[in-house]
Amino acid sequence: MIARSVRFECDSDEKITLLSAMSACVDLPDKDYEMIDLAGVWARERHVRRHKLDYGIQSIYSMRGCSSYQFNPFLALARENADEFQGQVYGFSLVYSGNFLAQTEVDNYDTARVLMGIHPNRFKWTLGKGESFQTPEMVMVYSEAGLNGMSQTFHKLYLSLIHI
């Protein structure tokens, strides 16, 4: 498990304005993955969508002001042969319930990149001297035990951190 976030600090006498604040950028050495995300509607939440990564940018996002059953701030990259109990899977979860962007990009060198954070549309944050802004954490997990292994890792992590 790896958790990433970014902290912006203003040490200038002049104010600075952030127009984008992504939490993490992760590069993978190849593009041989399928992207899995969870979309849905009322009474049909968390519909699993799975499709092969392709050149260019593929994204999921929400600008509703919160995460919801329509789009969840989560995506996974699974090898084509990965199933519920075997195969390599990377899982990415943004610990945030506001406007978000989660995207993958495949470049002309056949490498894949995952970018996740606060959606830049309608985002603007001004910092004065001595002020800071911390992005929400993006949590990344890896499993060689398929989608169930990834899910169990997330479950154990969040259950150990969240006490009801």
What do these predicted ranges mean?
Residues T111, L159-S160:
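Feature activates predominantly on carbohydrate-active enzymes
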Residues T111-L127:
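Short acidic, Pro/Gly- and aromatic-enriched capping/linker segments at domain boundaries
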